[in-house]
Amino acid sequence: METKITIRFFGSLVDLAGRQYVHLDAGINQTIKDCVERLGVPHTEVYFITLQKSFVVFDKIVENGDMYFVYPECNLDIPKEYILTPKYEGVPKFILDIHLGKLARLLRMLGISAEYGIVDDDEIVSKALSENLIILTRDRGILKRNEVTYGYILRSDDPKIQLREVTLRYSLQNWFAPFTRCMECNGELISVSKQGVQEQLPEKVKETFDEFAKCERCGKVYWGGTHYENMSLFIEKFLKSISKKEF
């Protein structure tokens, strides 16, 4: 017995599915979650689903002739029991897959917690769950795991565009605190005296700078200079682009 259904995707989910309307031969005893993820849309991207103007949950078994509407996160007032992926509460904190090193550094530069460096997907998921982190990835497979709650599929492979994507998706501009995190390890930076870090400073730096910061986690020392000025200009340009929705 055939089970042909139609799924209509809305908003950002259209990018993931590749089209707005999909006609699918679902097969026997398939849930709407199975069908949505088969089309390339991880459950972490789905906020709610309707069938004939009624809300449904992920384990709804699809039936021949069904037409489902699938929505991304939005500000509509949805009954709590039908919110399929809850909104992340509090200051967004991330864990990135091993292919997103440049994005991790950009997020850290802006003061956003971005854990990075774990190769194994199982370990990424475990850390995300234990520390309530949002998984950022280009790999849809990791976000299709049932145990994963928070995650985002990056649409672009350009780190600067990825930064824009994540900023707009999670309103990160509300939490930007530039130069407060270590770009190497994600640790928090604290102000230190020149005397306290002299042994770690090149001679020219000792002669030129008086203000320093040190990573509480790895001990790396930071100071101003051309690199700092270039990053400051990048941040200024990026913030303007966010407000104008450009970049």
Spans of model-derived segments:
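Short cysteine-rich clusters marking metal-coordination/redox-active sites
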Residues: 182-185, 215-218
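Short cysteine/histidine-rich metal-coordination sites, predominantly Zn2+-binding motifs
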Residues: 197-207, 230-241
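Ubiquitin-like/PB1-type beta-grasp interaction modules and other compact soluble beta-rich domains
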Residues: 1-93
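Short, polar loop motifs at secondary-structure junctions
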Residues: 10-12, 98-102, 137-142
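Short functional micro-motifs and their immediate structural scaffolds
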Residues: 187-193, 223
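Short metal-coordination and nucleic-acid-contact micro-motifs, chiefly zinc-binding Cys/His arrays
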Residues: 175-178, 208-211
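Short, charged N-terminal beta->alpha structural module
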Residues: 86-116
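BRCT (BRCA1 C-terminal) domain core and associated BRCT-interaction motifs
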Residues: 119-133, 140-143
